[in-house]
């Protein structure tokens, strides 16, 4: 086993085809987004962490989202082959895709993805992997930062997979120009 935490962050370049990225973004014009909130397991409440700077998100269905969702299986398979851990071969599934929208001055506070609130209904489990996808790169700012200070270089169509636990804190810096679109799903 490799002891370097960075080893378990896998970037799959151009995993999402440009045409699909463009189609998803175009179709998002018709979708209502809501202010993103984190679930606080101590207070059992949802709350923002960045006040007026909090990004917006949606689980809404848009044309192309199902195609992308089905292809995530292959990305997860690639990741499991990459980390090559014979004792970690099974997973039950992954959540429906959540789409994040960052307009100017919006960000996501530092956090880890050990999320339990997404498994309150039909799905049962604990997230083991986070899958992030980047639908565009024609904006300024909005850098994904891991471990407080490590900027992840990502481009349109890239997919990033990493463990969903306290060892992988991450945030998104404020967007300074344009609109940043990304997707997220959690493997359980």
PLM region spans:
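Fe(II)/2-oxoglutarate oxygenase catalytic core
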Residues: 1-159, 167-188
